[in-house]
């Protein structure tokens, strides 16, 4: 399990193959009613989140800032708690229990970090890293929709429609900026990418 990699080279993108993979597999298993497999895969994703999350937070707190082009990948820090929240709702029948509230609490913390990062995100050149917002924020919207249903919130249908409209507009903006960047030749980094 030894990896020849400097701490400064780590970034939140490493959550995707392990944490997201395990949690999404748990959600899929839960959808098919495979309880034991969903629990196993949830454990896999959760433990990977704890281990990698510790490494990544250490990197973000103690090492030089990520290159400007990679700043948007910090948005992935919001993904584990909201994806885990979505999966937990699928596993427990949509109840807002203790685990759901713990995941929501951490999701709120990471969402507040995202709000504080807006000025930094605005300085980053638009490129592929911005597509992490698509997965992360749609997972967050889905988690909010699960919460609205679990809490039987007033106006939940209207709030859901607003959230879905905002998500759709976000995807449209990403797609539009991507196409413009591709046409201008500014979307992809120059090869070879600078370290």
Protein language model regions, located:
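Hydrophobic membrane-spanning alpha-helices of multi-pass integral membrane proteins
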Residues: 76-84, 106-111, 133-144
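Short, highly charged, low-complexity non-transmembrane loops/tails of multi-pass membrane proteins
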Residues: 186-195
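Membrane-interface helix-loop-helix junctions at boundaries between adjacent transmembrane segments
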Residues: 1-45
